[in-house]
Swiss-Prot record:
Protein name as annotated: SsrA-binding protein
Chain's gene name: smpB
Major subcellular site: cytoplasm
The organism's taxonomic lineage, starting at the top: Bacteria, Pseudomonadati, Pseudomonadota, Gammaproteobacteria, Lysobacterales
Similarity remark: Belongs to the SmpB family.
Region (Disordered): 139-167
Disulphide bond pairs: none
Molecular function, one GO term: RNA binding
Domain of life: Bacteria
Organism per entry: Xylella fastidiosa (strain M12)
NCBIfam families noted in UniProt: PRK05422.1 (NF003843), smpB (TIGR00086)
């Protein structure tokens, strides 16, 4: 007998895995190294994230007292949010990392002049995780060079498609 629906089939999640992306980070920074970090969130923030109300556009991470905090990332509260909780959409949130990871990141930021930039927020086993990247700021000429490279890749693909259609 052919059973098409096994009992031990993994449940499909209804929420998409990626919550928010920081597309501007790739444009404005050279991303050197990426790390996964947890986020210390309040209940209303998790509900708002489930509703897709997170924005990483202006966010960055900084070091204070041997800990790493996220500032500038916006999580807009839901309209139905509780009245007894004051919801600050741009509050400072603590990033949860292992001590060894924190120490290496702090060292690279302080000694080598890197910046910590959030690049993505996503779900991992019903927990909100954030991908942060060690980054160096791009100069204006670097941005222009990257744009020219993207245009060339696009033109090259267009030429190859036209050539393959005619062949």
């Amino acid at each position: 007998m052919n059973n098409k629906h096994p009992k031990n089939k993994a449940k499909s999640t209804t929420t998409p895995k990626t919550i928010a992306l920081n597309k501007r980070a790739r444009h404005e920074y050279h991303l050197i190294e990426r790390h996964e970090a947890g986020l210390e969130l309040q209940g209303w923030e998790v509900k708002a994230i489930r509703a897709g109300r997170a924005n990483l556009g202006d966010g960055y991470a900084y070091v204070r007292d041997g800990e790493i905090f996220l500032i500038g990332a916006q999580i807009t509260p839901l309209i139905q949010a509780s009245t007894h909780v004051v919801a600050n959409d741009r509050r400072t949130r603590k990033l949860l990392l292992h001590r060894r990871q924190i120490d290496t990141l702090i060292g690279r930021v302080q000694r080598e002049g890197f910046t910590l930039v959030p690049t993505a927020m996503y779900w991992s086993k019903n927990r909100v995780k954030m991908e942060i990247a060690l980054a160096k700021g791009k100069q204006a000429h670097d941005k222009r060079h990257a744009e020219k490279e993207r245009e060339w890749q696009r033109d090259k693909q267009r030429i190859m498609r036209a050539h393959n259609r005619n062949a």
